[in-house]
Amino acid sequence: MNKVNYQKELDRVIERHQAAGEVPRLLLHVCCAPCSSYCLEYLSNYFDITVYYYNPNISIKEEYEYRLSEEKRFISLKEFKYPVKLTESEYRPGDFFAAVKGLEKEPEGGLRCKECFKLRLEASAKKAKEQGFDYFTTTLTISPLKNAALLNEIGAEMGEKYGVSWLYSDFKKKEGYKRSIELSREFELYRQNYCGCVFSRQCGDSQQY
């Protein structure tokens, strides 16, 4: 079975809308400012973007709010071709714990993470459908620690479920992750060393997300 090139899929969508002179509306689920930095710099040239901050996996409220404030700060400081808007969800960690019940001892990158992806992408699909967006996607594929194929599979499934188009991506391509590090340094963005949940924090992962 041939491996899907998600960047090429994204390129095709962009080229089609560019040829038609269209600027489609995109709901972009973001996990944090560093991961969103390159995604926004890149996608804002072609889409009318609203950032959606829904991350109930973040176990500490102060951490949740700090990452949100960094996202807002980056959006306010960075210049974009098309203005970027932001909508946030209330802090609901109970959503996460309910979704991963029974999977607490799973290793990082296992079934618990899959359920967390499903939770956040389903909420994003629902929001995109309710508010009439043309597409929705997530910044999560930029992380070297995240499985882009799995994220795209879940995103497409949720898009089909709610009747809204999933925008395929693998933001690690075109040196996206490297660019996100450069932008994080340029804007002095807070770069955490765990994804957000209490379980990943307990792992003491020294890699930055």
Language-model segments: residues:
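Nucleotide-activated chemistry modules centered on ATP-dependent adenylation/adenylyltransferase
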Residues: 1-38, 43-209
